[in-house]
Amino acid sequence: MKVSLRILVVGIAVLVFQSCKKPNAKINSQNKIMILGDSRVEGNRPDYESFRYELWKNLLDNGWAFDFVGTNYDNAKYPKHLGQFFDRNHEGHGGFRVDQILDGLEYYIDEAGVPSIVIFGGVGGNDALQGQSTALILSNTNAVIDYLQNVNPNITIFIDQLPPARSTVMTSTLWAQLDGIHNGILALATAQTTASSKVVAVDCFTGFDDSYLEEGDDSHYNETGAKWVADRWDAAMDAFYAGGKWSN
């Protein structure tokens, strides 16, 4: 069922988005990738890492042609790779729940353009920690997928079955909810896939452990963890496209 977007863009957030925005050199590619999610997408180098940089390197190494798009711009320092500067545009928002991402989607796409591929990470993490029910998390996630498919009926959406927080904060209740979210994401991916728009669930939790988290941080990646998660996204994308290469 298609869910209409609830128009709610907080003015302060809009100003922050605009102030963080910087123009990247134009990349001649129709493969527009929006990496969407929470602080695990946004990152805050050097305090903690996003998987975006490592995924960008993987995609370059594999010969993909693409352009990261989004209203946010990463101002941290990153080494060049294969002679190219890191494509810093993204749509990660620290602390956001899925409903807050849903509320911002119209603005993000109006400003950044319609993506052909969305990588939706950190789905349900802040929501669960803030006491939202699994049913509400999945309903909001379903609405995000609905909106994206409405603006681009041919969109491909990769969505994570998110990694856990540090084991010391994962109560039995949170573990049970995480399992419910994972199962729900898998079911949503199947139910929301159409003839022209594929939704792919990506296992970013099996094998994840505390060594992938920043020291003294209960939920954010260190460099090793960011690389591990990026490799999961990359493997899922490579498998989905059967080793083919996107062309400009």
Q: In which residue ranges do the predicted regions lie?
A:
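Sec-dependent signal peptide recognition
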Residues: K2-V10
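Bacterial Sec-dependent N-terminal signal peptides
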Residues: V16-N31, G243-N248
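Loop/turn elements at helix/coil->beta-strand transitions in domains of secreted/extracellular proteins
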Residues: S29-I33, N62-D67, G113-I119, N152-F158, ...
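Histidine-centered active-site loop/cap adjacent to the catalytic His
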Residues: L36, I101, G216-N248
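Active-site-proximal beta-strand/loop segments in catalytic clefts of secreted hydrolases
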Residues: L36-R40, N44, V69-D74, G121-N126, ...
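Conserved SGNH/GDSL esterase-like catalytic core that processes O-acyl groups on lipids
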Residues: R40-S139, D179
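Active-site segments of SGNH/GDSL-like serine hydrolases
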Residues: G122-N126, D146-G180, D203-F205
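Substrate-gating cap/lid alpha-helix
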Residues: P164-D203, E223-K227
